[in-house]
Amino acid sequence: MTNLVLQLRRIAGIEVVANRAARRVVMVAAFALLTALSAYVAVPIPGTQVPVTLQTLVVVLAGALLGPGLGAASQVTYLAAGMLGAPVFSGGAAGIAWLLGPTGGYLLAFPVAAVVAGALAGRSGANRIVATVRLGLALAAGAAVILVGGASQLAIITGDAGAAIALGVAPFLVGEVVKLAVAVVIAARLRNRTLELV
Protein backbone atom coordinates (compact mmCIF):
# COMPACT_ATOMS: atom_id res chain seq x y z
CA MET A 1 0.00 0.00 0.00
CA THR A 2 2.80 2.41 0.85
CA ASN A 3 4.55 1.74 -2.46
CA LEU A 4 1.31 2.38 -4.35
CA VAL A 5 0.78 5.70 -2.56
CA LEU A 6 4.37 6.76 -3.26
CA GLN A 7 4.03 5.80 -6.92
CA LEU A 8 0.77 7.72 -7.24
CA ARG A 9 2.31 10.79 -5.61
CA ARG A 10 5.30 10.56 -7.95
CA ILE A 11 3.01 10.25 -10.99
CA ALA A 12 0.82 13.10 -9.75
CA GLY A 13 3.91 15.24 -9.21
CA ILE A 14 5.05 14.59 -12.76
CA GLU A 15 1.58 15.45 -14.00
CA VAL A 16 1.58 18.71 -12.04
CA VAL A 17 4.97 19.65 -13.50
CA ALA A 18 3.79 18.74 -17.01
CA ASN A 19 0.59 20.74 -16.56
CA ARG A 20 2.53 23.72 -15.25
CA ALA A 21 4.94 23.59 -18.20
CA ALA A 22 2.01 23.32 -20.60
CA ARG A 23 0.30 26.30 -18.97
CA ARG A 24 3.48 28.34 -19.29
CA VAL A 25 3.80 27.51 -22.99
CA VAL A 26 0.15 28.40 -23.55
CA MET A 27 0.46 31.71 -21.67
CA VAL A 28 3.64 32.68 -23.55
CA ALA A 29 1.98 31.84 -26.87
CA ALA A 30 -1.20 33.68 -25.87
CA PHE A 31 0.67 36.88 -25.06
CA ALA A 32 2.71 36.61 -28.26
CA LEU A 33 -0.59 36.33 -30.15
CA LEU A 34 -2.14 39.22 -28.21
CA THR A 35 0.89 41.36 -29.06
CA ALA A 36 0.49 40.47 -32.74
CA LEU A 37 -3.24 41.22 -32.71
CA SER A 38 -2.70 44.52 -30.91
CA ALA A 39 -0.39 45.61 -33.75
CA TYR A 40 -3.42 45.62 -36.04
CA VAL A 41 -5.10 48.26 -33.88
CA ALA A 42 -2.94 51.05 -35.34
CA VAL A 43 -3.76 54.74 -35.50
CA PRO A 44 -1.42 56.80 -37.69
CA ILE A 45 -0.05 60.02 -36.23
CA PRO A 46 0.50 62.88 -38.69
CA GLY A 47 4.16 63.77 -39.06
CA THR A 48 5.56 60.47 -37.82
CA GLN A 49 6.04 57.03 -39.35
CA VAL A 50 5.21 55.31 -36.07
CA PRO A 51 1.52 54.59 -35.40
CA VAL A 52 -0.15 54.33 -32.01
CA THR A 53 -0.98 50.69 -31.25
CA LEU A 54 -2.21 48.76 -28.24
CA GLN A 55 1.06 46.86 -28.10
CA THR A 56 2.51 48.77 -25.15
CA LEU A 57 -0.50 47.77 -23.08
CA VAL A 58 -0.04 44.08 -23.97
CA VAL A 59 3.73 44.11 -23.45
CA VAL A 60 3.59 45.56 -19.94
CA LEU A 61 0.71 43.25 -19.08
CA ALA A 62 2.81 40.30 -20.24
CA GLY A 63 5.49 41.26 -17.72
CA ALA A 64 3.05 41.99 -14.91
CA LEU A 65 0.84 38.94 -15.40
CA LEU A 66 3.42 36.32 -16.40
CA GLY A 67 6.44 37.62 -14.51
CA PRO A 68 9.65 38.93 -16.06
CA GLY A 69 10.95 35.69 -17.58
CA LEU A 70 7.78 34.44 -19.23
CA GLY A 71 6.73 37.97 -20.16
CA ALA A 72 10.01 38.43 -22.01
CA ALA A 73 9.65 34.97 -23.58
CA SER A 74 6.27 35.97 -25.00
CA GLN A 75 7.81 39.05 -26.62
CA VAL A 76 10.81 37.16 -27.98
CA THR A 77 8.32 34.68 -29.47
CA TYR A 78 6.40 37.56 -31.06
CA LEU A 79 9.57 39.10 -32.52
CA ALA A 80 10.80 35.73 -33.80
CA ALA A 81 7.48 35.14 -35.56
CA GLY A 82 7.76 38.53 -37.26
CA MET A 83 11.39 38.03 -38.25
CA LEU A 84 10.50 34.65 -39.74
CA GLY A 85 7.85 36.22 -41.96
CA ALA A 86 4.59 36.07 -40.01
CA PRO A 87 2.62 39.30 -40.63
CA VAL A 88 2.57 40.31 -36.97
CA PHE A 89 4.04 43.80 -37.06
CA SER A 90 1.95 46.96 -37.49
CA GLY A 91 -0.05 46.92 -40.70
CA GLY A 92 0.69 43.23 -41.27
CA ALA A 93 4.38 43.82 -41.93
CA ALA A 94 7.01 41.13 -41.38
CA GLY A 95 10.71 40.46 -41.77
CA ILE A 96 13.99 41.43 -40.19
CA ALA A 97 14.13 44.65 -42.21
CA TRP A 98 11.11 45.93 -40.27
CA LEU A 99 13.22 45.86 -37.11
CA LEU A 100 15.79 48.12 -38.74
CA GLY A 101 13.26 50.82 -39.64
CA PRO A 102 11.52 53.59 -37.67
CA THR A 103 9.48 51.20 -35.50
CA GLY A 104 12.27 48.70 -34.87
CA GLY A 105 13.56 50.30 -31.68
CA TYR A 106 10.14 50.10 -30.08
CA LEU A 107 9.74 46.45 -31.10
CA LEU A 108 13.21 45.42 -29.96
CA ALA A 109 12.52 47.00 -26.57
CA PHE A 110 9.45 44.80 -25.98
CA PRO A 111 11.26 41.91 -24.20
CA VAL A 112 13.22 44.33 -22.00
CA ALA A 113 10.04 46.24 -21.17
CA ALA A 114 8.30 43.02 -20.13
CA VAL A 115 11.24 42.16 -17.86
CA VAL A 116 11.25 45.63 -16.28
CA ALA A 117 7.47 45.69 -15.74
CA GLY A 118 7.45 42.17 -14.32
CA ALA A 119 10.48 42.61 -12.08
CA LEU A 120 9.41 45.95 -10.64
CA ALA A 121 5.81 44.85 -10.09
CA GLY A 122 6.99 42.10 -7.76
CA ARG A 123 4.38 40.19 -5.80
CA SER A 124 1.22 41.81 -4.49
CA GLY A 125 1.45 42.95 -0.90
CA ALA A 126 -1.13 43.10 1.85
CA ASN A 127 -1.74 46.82 1.33
CA ARG A 128 -3.82 47.08 -1.84
CA ILE A 129 -3.14 50.80 -2.42
CA VAL A 130 0.63 50.39 -2.13
CA ALA A 131 0.51 47.33 -4.40
CA THR A 132 -1.53 49.21 -7.02
CA VAL A 133 0.81 52.22 -6.96
CA ARG A 134 3.81 49.91 -7.25
CA LEU A 135 2.12 48.13 -10.16
CA GLY A 136 1.39 51.44 -11.89
CA LEU A 137 5.00 52.58 -11.52
CA ALA A 138 6.27 49.22 -12.78
CA LEU A 139 4.06 49.36 -15.87
CA ALA A 140 5.07 52.98 -16.50
CA ALA A 141 8.74 51.97 -16.31
CA GLY A 142 8.10 49.22 -18.85
CA ALA A 143 6.36 51.68 -21.18
CA ALA A 144 9.26 54.12 -20.75
CA VAL A 145 11.69 51.40 -21.85
CA ILE A 146 9.70 51.03 -25.08
CA LEU A 147 9.69 54.79 -25.73
CA VAL A 148 13.42 55.08 -25.02
CA GLY A 149 14.15 52.14 -27.33
CA GLY A 150 12.05 53.64 -30.08
CA ALA A 151 13.48 57.13 -29.72
CA SER A 152 17.02 55.75 -29.65
CA GLN A 153 16.61 53.97 -32.96
CA LEU A 154 14.87 56.99 -34.48
CA ALA A 155 17.79 59.16 -33.34
CA ILE A 156 20.21 56.78 -35.06
CA ILE A 157 18.13 56.76 -38.27
CA THR A 158 17.53 60.52 -38.40
CA GLY A 159 20.80 61.64 -36.80
CA ASP A 160 18.79 64.07 -34.66
CA ALA A 161 17.96 63.21 -31.05
CA GLY A 162 15.66 66.21 -30.67
CA ALA A 163 13.61 65.20 -33.69
CA ALA A 164 13.51 61.62 -32.43
CA ILE A 165 11.99 62.76 -29.14
CA ALA A 166 9.60 65.15 -30.88
CA LEU A 167 8.43 62.48 -33.34
CA GLY A 168 8.96 59.28 -31.38
CA VAL A 169 8.01 60.13 -27.79
CA ALA A 170 5.98 63.33 -27.43
CA PRO A 171 3.07 62.33 -29.72
CA PHE A 172 2.55 59.12 -27.75
CA LEU A 173 2.54 60.37 -24.16
CA VAL A 174 -1.20 60.99 -23.78
CA GLY A 175 -2.03 57.63 -25.34
CA GLU A 176 0.51 55.91 -23.11
CA VAL A 177 -1.09 57.35 -19.98
CA VAL A 178 -4.51 56.06 -21.07
CA LYS A 179 -3.12 52.61 -21.96
CA LEU A 180 -1.26 52.44 -18.65
CA ALA A 181 -4.41 53.27 -16.70
CA VAL A 182 -6.23 50.42 -18.46
CA ALA A 183 -3.26 48.09 -17.91
CA VAL A 184 -3.15 48.84 -14.17
CA VAL A 185 -6.86 48.03 -13.80
CA ILE A 186 -6.48 44.76 -15.73
CA ALA A 187 -3.26 43.74 -13.98
CA ALA A 188 -4.59 44.56 -10.51
CA ARG A 189 -7.57 42.27 -11.09
CA LEU A 190 -5.77 39.36 -12.78
CA ARG A 191 -2.22 39.42 -11.46
CA ASN A 192 -2.46 37.05 -8.51
CA ARG A 193 -4.44 34.49 -10.50
CA THR A 194 -2.10 34.44 -13.49
CA LEU A 195 1.05 34.28 -11.38
CA GLU A 196 -0.40 31.25 -9.59
CA LEU A 197 -0.99 29.56 -12.96
CA VAL A 198 2.55 29.99 -14.18
Name each region found by the language model.
Residues 42-116:
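Alpha-helical membrane segments and adjacent membrane-interface helices in multi-pass membrane proteins
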